[in-house]
Amino acid sequence: MKIIDAHVHIYPDKIAQKASQSISDFYNLDAAYDGKVSTLNEACELAGVSQCLVHSVATNPSQVGSINSFIRKTAMQHPRKFFGFATVHPLAKDIEFQIENAVAAGLSGFKLHPDFQKFFADGHEAMQTFEIIDGRLPVLIHAGDNRKPYSGPERILKLCKAFP
């Protein structure tokens, strides 16, 4: 049986510990791993996971380019194992450019995180982002954190109805 992990955050080694700790702190949970690609490979081997959707989240628009370069490079180094999902930032002035670059780079989809990126999943910026993506690639969107107002089920439902 093929096992695919559809939600894996990865980071460059130099920031992996800090980034993983930030997520652990945000959710008040212990991280399952340290965010490094080498550790992910080891964990996949032990668990029998054959493929992963890998991504990271730009918490501000200036991070998009470097994150997507890292994700693309990592996916290219592991072409049958990792499928890279681009980050875009819906509040960015150059959102269309970000999306077009990700598509042209051959990334496999998009990852959005309303709570970290501070946009409403049913707001104007999200709707505009989905209009530009126009169904060309799948979108993985964080949902349901009841501590923040951005990604509740009712907001995701509105987004899904607008873009079935």
What spans do the regions from the language model cover?
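A generic "structured core" feature
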Residues: 2-11, 45, 98, 102-103, ...
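Active-site gating/metal-coordination segments in enzymes
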Residues: 50-51, 61-148
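Short, surface-exposed alpha-helical segments at coil->helix boundaries
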Residues: 34-38, 65-69, 150-154
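Acidic, amphipathic alpha-helical patches
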Residues: 40, 95, 99, 156
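Hydrophobic packing residues within well-ordered alpha-helices of enzyme cores
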Residues: 71, 156-159
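N-terminal cationic-hydrophobic initiation segments that often serve targeting/anchoring roles
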Residues: 44, 75-79, 160-161
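An N-terminally biased module of ancient metal coordination in phosphate/nucleic-acid-related enzymes
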Residues: 1-57, 61-62
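Histidine/acidic-residue-rich catalytic or RNA/ligand-binding cores of hydrolases
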Residues: 15-17, 150-157
